[in-house]
A protein has these predicted regions:
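Short Gly/Pro-enriched turn/cap motifs at secondary-structure boundaries
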Residues: 1-3, 162
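Cytosolic catalytic headpieces and adjacent flexible linkers of membrane translocases
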Residues: 9-165
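A short, compositionally biased
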Residues: 5-7
Length: 165
């Protein structure tokens, strides 16, 4: 299952001859476990510049409302029974996938009706701030007060209350 702490999921697959570890997850997390990148069939060291370029592309996709997941792999896993988180290292970045999960067509109208009735809509999501902002803008939810979960945890009750108003 997906591990929300590590923000990734790994599986071991076998074709009968070799075992392969495949890991998918948050781009930043996958980049942190990759030492190589497969680009157009050529495997090479993943440099700081390559990582920064991937993060820039990912951010641009997020701003368009796309969620992005990275995929990495590692060949020749020795024993599946002894597989552990430690095996999620020195992996090869295979690529990343952007997908759109747009709000339902009825969402914008429903939110407008709630606002007209004096009900303020608050969004809680596991998405990053760029995806959240793009989706909220599509349904006319104010994006001036986006607070990341990691920051909410550090706020006092009084600070949270001040941000709500």
């Amino acid at each position: 299952p997906f591990d929300f702490t590590r923000r990734r999921l790994s599986v071991v697959v076998s074709d009968g001859k070799k075992k392969q570890l495949i890991t998918k997850g948050a781009v930043e997390e996958i980049l942190s476990i990759c030492t190589m990148v497969d680009y157009k069939g050529e495997v090479s060291d993943i440099t700081r510049d390559i990582k920064q370029n991937i993060l820039k592309i990912t951010k641009d996709l997020n701003k368009q409302g796309l969620r992005v997941v990275a995929v990495a792999q590692k060949n020749d896993i020795t024993d599946v029974k002894d597989f552990s988180i430690k095996d999620e290292s020195k992996m090869v970045l295979m690529g990343f996938i952007g997908f759109l999960d747009p709000p339902k067509e009825s969402a914008k109208g429903a939110i407008e009706r709630l606002n007209q009735d004096g009900i303020r809509v608050i969004v809680l999501t596991g998405d990053n701030e760029y995806v959240t902002k793009a989706i909220c803008e599509k349904v006319n939810i104010n994006t001036d007060k986006i607070i990341l979960g990691s920051k909410v945890e550090k706020l006092s009750d009084a600070e949270v209350e001040a941000k709500r108003s």
